[in-house]
């Protein structure tokens, strides 16, 4: 009897193993983002994101649609400031993931929009001299991107987020704004 894991592996092997079909139907593109976020409850942090975008389809009269999956990394501090979530400072690097859809238009070139969900784990956050504790964030991200000229050198990213901050002794909602750069496709 074939187990569920074996069946799943066989299906994945069949789809992914035939690179001609997989590559022609669903091209996979690398994606990189870096952006700085500020929030209405005091959050301020810089995020680096690395992952892939899977091309789903092109709308003949509109955008191409991509499914993206990103690994997120937030350092304890950057050049000019310490990272904060709400009013709490990070004691070590945080990480998370993002999954969402991204629409990218050809005309006008560089115009795009994203809707995604993010989950960030803040392993050690503290306020003052208090003992560091764990926190997390669940974020609904809405983003827009555009280019500043041709040839395409810079793709700007603007984000508006609604975040649920699950802090050690409190839960808060926060509106966040982010500005950064992303890869072009």
Predicted regions, residues:
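Cleavable N-terminal export/targeting peptides
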Residues: 1-27, 185
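Short glycine/proline- and aromatic-enriched beta-strand/turn motifs that initiate or cap beta-hairpins
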Residues: 20-86
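Short loop/turn motifs that connect adjacent beta-strands in outer-membrane beta-barrel proteins
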Residues: 22-28, 56-67, 104-113, 146-157, ...
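Membrane-embedded beta-strand positions of outer-membrane beta-barrel proteins
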Residues: 28-34, 67-74, 99, 113-117, ...
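Transmembrane beta-strands of outer-membrane beta-barrel pores
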Residues: 34-40, 56, 71-80, 105, ...
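Flexible, solvent-exposed loop segments that connect beta-strands
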Residues: 38-42, 75-94, 122-136, 166-170
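Membrane-embedded beta-strands of outer-membrane beta-barrel proteins
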Residues: 48-54, 99-101, 140-144, 177-179
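Outer-membrane beta-barrel "beta-signal"
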Residues: 172-185
């Amino acid at each position: 009897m074939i187990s569920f894991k074996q069946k799943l592996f066989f299906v994945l092997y069949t789809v992914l193993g035939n690179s001609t079909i997989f590559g022609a139907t669903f091209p996979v593109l690398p994606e990189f983002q870096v952006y700085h976020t500020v929030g209405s409850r005091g959050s301020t942090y810089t995020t680096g994101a690395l992952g892939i975008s899977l091309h789903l389809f092109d709308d003949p009269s509109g955008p191409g649609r991509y499914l993206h999956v990103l690994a997120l990394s937030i350092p304890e501090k950057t050049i000019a400031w310490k990272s904060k979530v709400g009013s709490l400072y990070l004691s070590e690097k945080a990480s998370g993931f993002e999954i969402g859809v991204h629409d990218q238009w050809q005309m006008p070139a560089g115009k795009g929009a994203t809707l995604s969900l993010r989950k960030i784990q803040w392993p050690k956050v503290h306020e003052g001299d208090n003992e560091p504790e764990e926190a997390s964030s669940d974020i609904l991200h809405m983003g827009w991107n555009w280019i500043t000229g041709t040839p395409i050198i810079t793709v700007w990213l603007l984000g508006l987020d609604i975040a649920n901050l699950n802090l050690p002794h409190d839960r808060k909602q926060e509106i966040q704004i982010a500005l950064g750069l992303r890869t072009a496709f």
